[in-house]
Amino acid sequence: FIGRQGRNRRLFSVKDIKPRTEEFLKEYPVVLSTTYTAKNCIDKNWVFDYVIMDEASQVDITTGALALSCAMNAVIVGDDKQLPNVIDERTKTALKAIESAYRIDEKYRSTTHSFLQSCCEVFTDAPQTLLREHYRCHPKIIEFCNHLFYNGELVPMTQDKGEENVVTVIQTVKGQHARGHYNQREIDVIQSEVLPNLTNNGSVGIITPYRNQAEAINRQLGTKIASTVHKYQGRECDNIIMSMVDNTISEFSDDPNLLNVAIS
């Protein structure tokens, strides 16, 4: 909870919040919450003036709708070119049955749309603002994403200081080394050739499209340095090693949203 500054603030216990919502919000007008709990953290007869939802591309439609139901106005923030929410197969099967039985319009379907995508298609007249400035990656890295995914609309705010080898591609020797979303040859090359060159260059993270590969890397290196792209979204390191696993194009590893998040 974020309170008003410049005076002594009243204190509330957790049990006070629902029965004393009006008093509480006057003292603490900004409430931080997950999308799941936004509706239940205040009295059911009370609504916020605004709900601001961040990372809306990772929110499913049902949960997003619940969050909207507790506010008069909404600001939806997200990037539909990043990874959407993940639905497990059991839930997806159940949702498809419901969508088919009730002939749900495509733009409201949780199996094909994130909350952000649905809002963009439903509220076509709502004003949209592109946050163009990019502060994370080296210009040579973000320009790849900018050209491939954002139609050149991003403005890199980082500086190119003439660093060498900002982006390096290492192609492993061909062979039967990629099985079951796991590539031992890549792991060996990362351990013997890539990591030794990064020991004095800041923090290092390893990302991969597949959980099997991440687990195998961590076992071999004896540390939790690797993770899937989905779990790594939003994090950053000075150096990122991307282990693609597949030696041929696959639907999963060539997914544009996954590649955008992984590279940036």
Predicted features and spans:
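Conserved helicase NTPase catalytic core signature
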Residues: 1-47
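Conserved helicase motor core of SF1/SF2 NTP-dependent helicases
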Residues: 36-53, 57-264
